[in-house]
Amino acid sequence: MGLIWLLLLSLLEPGWPAAGPGARLRRDAGGRGGVYEHLGGAPRRRKLYCATKYHLQLHPSGRVNGSLENSAYSILEITAVEVGIVAIRGLFSGRYLAMNKRGRLYASEHYSAECEFVERIHELGYNTYASRLYRTVSSTPGARRQPSAERLWYVSVNGKGRPRRGFKTRRTQKSSLFLPRVLDHRDHEMVRQLQSGLPRPPGKGVQPRRRRQKQSPDNLEPSHVQASRLGSQLEASAH
């Protein structure tokens, strides 16, 4: 009889909270297939380091590729727009990472549905970013209701630093795995100098063949040009 009472008391003790209809399963970065639970707020400044050893970068021209070197265009702002859905913006290019209906990555000047990606956490701390809008749906009869019949299109950078088309990607491929890296001291110095509006450092640069004119606020270089020039100078000083 005493054993029965002990069992009943153990059932009444507080344990794991019951999952109600609106409860979400929270997982940390080590959780398999987990999602980040933050909503909105300040963007995370990160560099997305692909398992192929390239940093994802967004150019002012709209081009997307990978860089092996320290580049201002690889400094990104990752903002959660919904639970598990993020927008990725280049800090100095001012453009959003986007994927079109053909699976091509590009840097969009304006935010749209093509700029939203599903962020998932995988083992070893790597993340994947899949287009929220586009995916491959099987045409097999009856497969429409099966989640396994859909194949997501992932952000991917191959071993040559070139973006892969979404429909050719897989979640388990190295080219689809990204490690969010915190900015180092060189990145912070680059951000500080560019945001403080310091004059560009002296050195050789591509100059138009015309008469020298006094530099006015209207003739100042755009921030993305300063970013490129400053990145080159920091690389040279590091060596």
Swiss-Prot record:
InterPro entries: Fibroblast_GF_fam (IPR002209), IL1/FGF (IPR008996)
Protein's cellular compartments: Secreted
Keywords: Developmental protein, Differentiation, Disease variant, Glycoprotein, Growth factor, Mitogen, Proto-oncogene, Secreted, Signal
Annotated signal sequence range: 1-17
Sugar-modified residues: N65
Region (Disordered): 193-239
PROSITE patterns found in the cross-reference section: HBGF_FGF (PS00247)
Disulfide bond sites: none
SMART domains linked to this entry: FGF
Lineage top rank: taxon: Eukaryota
Cellular component GO terms, alphabetical: cytoplasm; extracellular region; extracellular space
Biased composition (Polar residues): 225-239
Pfam families xref list: FGF
Disorder this protein is connected to according to its UniProt record: Deafness with labyrinthine aplasia, microtia and microdontia: Unique autosomal recessive syndrome characterized by type I microtia, microdontia, and profound congenital deafness associated with a complete absence of inner ear structures (Michel aplasia).
Subunit comment: Interacts with FGFR1 and FGFR2. Affinity between fibroblast growth factors (FGFs) and their receptors is increased by heparan sulfate glycosaminoglycans that function as coreceptors.
Similarity section: Belongs to the heparin-binding growth factors family.
Protein name: Fibroblast growth factor 3
Taxonomic lineage from the root: Eukaryota, Metazoa, Chordata, Craniata, Vertebrata
